[in-house]
């Protein structure tokens, strides 16, 4: 998957943050608008819900990496290096969606969550296009990763009125906000979101839920490009409007 950077800023951390907020707000509003317009003949009978959650992410190795960094091994550009280690991180997010009364097992959902899987300081070994082999220390790189996903969700409401397992898949937009040597930059990448979980109904409107997510994308940030994947475990509280 070819990932194109949106824009890179020198010392424009403020401008980067403004762009980040605009993109995130636009994505959320568009997805919520879709909930009300995709199925105009049936939305009056839909079961709507919103929820918030928190948890932990456990990223896998950042693989198939190319790196450009003037501080590593005297300076390298477009070098292939070994897999990089990312930090585990706290996760926070919100979601909204609906299920149809006519098809209570099927729904659409929008999900936005954020985490900070910084690149650890580590020794990297690699090679350049001209055949030079090198080893050097890569400094820690701060990374804020926000994901917006548009999901198709399937549940099993007939199994139990109280316990409802579910699962689904969705298209995901990954917003990587990183900084290196005092410079801040934002890049957008495309990927997917797989998830499975269960809801435990407390009242006709309130439910607890636990969920596992698997994310995968090709990210490009701070002159680093590679394949990102992570496993995420979250717990949260959900409100159903039309129960």
Question: Which positions does each model-derived feature cover?
Answer:
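Predominantly the C-terminal beta-signal and adjacent terminal strand-loop region
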Residues: 63, 80, 112-113, 117, ...
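Extracytoplasmic loops and strand-loop junctions of Gram-negative outer membrane beta-barrel proteins
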Residues: 74-81, 131-137, 178-180, 218-220
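Outer-membrane beta-barrel translocator domains and adjoining extracellular loop/strand segments
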Residues: 62-69, 119-127, 177-185, 220-227
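Surface-exposed extracellular loop regions of Gram-negative outer-membrane beta-barrel proteins
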Residues: 167-174, 195-196, 207-210
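Short glycine/proline- and aromatic-enriched beta-strand/turn motifs that initiate or cap beta-hairpins
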Residues: 40-100, 232-243
């Amino acid at each position: 998957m070819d990932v194109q950077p949106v824009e890179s800023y020198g010392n424009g951390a403020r401008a980067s943050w403004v762009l980040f907020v605009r993109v995130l707000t636009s994505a959320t509003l568009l997805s919520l608008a879709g909930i009300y317009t995709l199925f105009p003949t049936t939305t009056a009978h839909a079961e709507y819900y919103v929820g918030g959650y928190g948890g932990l992410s456990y990223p896998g190795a950042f693989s198939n990496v190319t790196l450009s960094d003037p501080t590593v091994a005297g300076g390298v550009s477009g070098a292939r290096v070994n897999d990089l280690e990312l930090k585990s991180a706290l996760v926070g997010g919100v979601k909204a969606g609906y299920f149809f009364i006519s098809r209570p097992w099927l729904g659409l959902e929008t999900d936005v969550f954020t985490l900070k899987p910084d690149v650890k300081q580590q020794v990297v070994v690699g090679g350049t296009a001209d055949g030079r082999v090198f080893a050097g220390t890569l400094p820690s790189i701060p990374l804020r990763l926000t994901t917006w996903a548009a999901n198709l969700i399937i549940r099993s409401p007939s199994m139990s009125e109280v316990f409802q397992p579910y699962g689904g898949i969705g298209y995901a937009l990954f917003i990587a906000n990183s900084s290196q040597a005092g410079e801040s930059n934002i890049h957008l990448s495309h990927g997917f979101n797989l998830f499975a979980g269960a809801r435990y109904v407390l009242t006709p409107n309130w439910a607890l839920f636990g969920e596992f997510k698997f994310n995968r994308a090709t990210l490009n940030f701070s002159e680093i490009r590679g394949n990102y994947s992570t496993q995420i475990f979250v717990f949260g509280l959900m409100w159903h409007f039309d129960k």
